[in-house]
């Protein structure tokens, strides 16, 4: 199996690295400060100004929903193509959300894209893809909960 990166992936690596250097790393301290302010105020579950700005910039550069394979909504990358981008994004605790590639949203979007009804996709997938809402999931094992 050939594990070398395609020209497309190398270009995306350069774009993601440049975005991280120009926008994400410099925003980390401000993000942490905003979150601390929200925690002290008793409501850490609200969007930060800096994260919304990062999302807007990532969308504008088409560095958005890179995780979605075989989909009209994503970059159409395979896992092998997406992995080196994850390595770059994984260098910052705020990057996955900035690129709309954070758990559990990614898995939930994949499930909705593949198996959701048109109504479910309209109600939940579209706002998740746009980064307007967040999602969750819960699971248990038989005879446990």
Segments from the language model and where they lie:
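Intrinsic disorder at enzyme termini
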Residues: 1-16
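Residue-level signal for inorganic ion chemistry
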Residues: 9, 20, 117
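N-terminal glycine-rich anion-binding loops that anchor highly charged ligand groups
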Residues: 18-28, 58-59
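Glycine-rich flavin
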Residues: 29-145
